């Protein structure tokens, strides 16, 4: 990810997503979740997006997609297994794009999609993939699909791309605290979200309108299933993931605090030694002696942040924690609303029962 690339500001402002793409993503992810493939492999469901870019309208139109090859577990100790997997993945991707072109389907790659529960799962590998795709085309995006919300009746597909500042740091592969601070990069502006408009065919729109107007169509509006609080497991899972991220952030804060103290101590020591050396050189020049070099002071090793990727992991953990908190907040607010509605309905039923009892007693008298 340290390859020097030219950073081009993207011009796309919104995304037009075909309903066929939504159906294929949902079917792909749900089939793998039902089979347990994601839990066994440990990888997220992923695929490639194809479509067209309309610069005059600042619109990215995603018209089709296809899944990518999964990384199969290596049974034997084969050193070339990873390379063979990448070659197989690239070959199958090219074959699929060639078939798209033959069938007169849009074959221009405009990004990729992945599934992450609760919309949180941004990792170092995902950032590398986003950088590679945006380096290939500045308009490329990633679609993050949340299967948990979809199973709860709310389709969740969000489009993201790296901001210009994040792309600059990713091209240098340098996430030191000084560079992150000078770029003004935080977890809130590291990624840019684009609005999505889902496009359906005209026949589908007509069918939905006819179903809504049809008297024989039962909407089940009096069903009590809308009051079910069926989010206990997902809420518990999101809270546990949030707690794990907070623990990692606490460790990172301790490392960053130690690094800040060591860096300040190092800068003060270098400044003090430089001042003394300059005064000593002035005295030597006054006596006619040659000045002493500053090389030994410059060779003093500066402290390093004890993390593998600088502040990148901290930024991603903060972003995931924020996504998990938003999910928990949405679920709890919906559950509280359902509880209030159920309580009001129960009280109304009790009052109605009492009124009917009083009226029957008065009539018998």
From Swiss-Prot:
| Gene3D superfamilies attached to this UniProt entry | Cytidine Deaminase, domain 2
Q: Where in the cell is it found?
A: Cytoplasm
Q: Where is the composition biased (Basic and acidic residues)?
A: 277-287
The disulfides recorded in the entry are none
Residue segments, region Disordered: 276-295
UniProt lists the family membership as follows: Belongs to the eIF-3 subunit H family.
What name does the UniProt record give this protein? Eukaryotic translation initiation factor 3 subunit H
Question: Which organism was this protein described from?
Answer: Caenorhabditis briggsae
